[in-house]
Amino acid sequence: MSVFTPLERSTLEAFLAPYDLGRLRDFRGIAEGSENSNFFVSLEHGEFVLTLVERGPVQDLPFFIELLDVLHEDGLPVPYALRTRDGEALRRLEGKPALLQPRLAGRHERQPNAHHCQEVGDLLGHLHAATRGRILERPSDRGLPWMLEQGANLAPRLPEQARALLAPALAEIAALDAERPALPRANLHADLFRDNVLFDGPHLAGLIDFYNACSGWMLYDLAITLNDWCSNADGSLDPARARALLAAYANRRPFTALEAEHWPSMLRVACVRFWLSRLIAAEAFAGQDVLIHDPAEFEMRLAQRQNVEIHLPFAL
């Protein structure tokens, strides 16, 4: 179970008291998390999720709180930070920054079809539309410079075939970092995977885990999302799912010609980002009782993205 900071019941009860949500009925750790400690918390007046933030600078947490407030106010189904009776949203528990949020209904969709992907494309388009007019600035701590640094560090330890795949991808990232093309920007979720979306029946009911959120190119966020939701087991893209997601997104925001030009490379960049972070996690948590996602999944996806046949619709 990926709970890095276990909690005693009495400690949790004392923490929850200022929210005036009634007595604690039950709580349990959430196994799916791979970076933070998360708990389902059942209180007299509702169901909630408690997050202890284990990674990242504490000074960035007000950004996440403000972003979720903006998205919640725009009607997106996101968890927002609850306030205590004194108006506090960000607190500390067992020495870690802690947030209490409403628990959203629904379940993860492990085998999405075109309908699920259409819902996700519409959701991402809504998220970008809600923030592009007033972007809350936060650079990603796993952006292009991070990829170049970590790629160089990891490459010598990779098998020859993996190094041969990574090297041209890093060269492409270096060129993109130098060019910094004027692609449209907004706030990004930057981790919109299947395990961060909740469906209640056929309807998308929630988007969670914003702790990688940042500001940046909307196209990059779209590439991250499509790589997970529309990939087959061998890493190739499923055309029906991919086109459903892209069409729904385009209904919210038409693409530009520059985005169409950079689309294939952005899909590859998004693969590299998660291949590297998974390799790092696999080394750091080897032998521990922590959920580790398979790095090979994104190695396969990067190999499949060398020739991209799914293009952006309605490019202007």
From Swiss-Prot:
Pathway: Amino-acid biosynthesis; L-threonine biosynthesis; L-threonine from L-aspartate: step 4/5. InterPro entries: Aminoglycoside_PTrfase (IPR002575), Homoserine_kinase_II (IPR005280), Kinase-like_dom_sf (IPR011009), Pseudomonas-type_ThrB (IPR050249). It catalyses: L-homoserine + ATP = O-phospho-L-homoserine + ADP + H(+). GO terms for biological process: threonine biosynthetic process. It is an enzyme of class 2 (transferase). Pfam families: APH (PF01636). GO terms for molecular function: ATP binding; homoserine kinase activity. The keyword Phosphoprotein does not apply. The keyword Isomerase does not apply. Coiled coil: none annotated. Keywords: Amino-acid biosynthesis, ATP-binding, Kinase, Nucleotide-binding, Threonine biosynthesis, Transferase. Its EC number is 2.7.1.39. It comes from the Bacteria. Belongs to the pseudomonas-type ThrB family. This is Homoserine kinase. The gene is thrB.
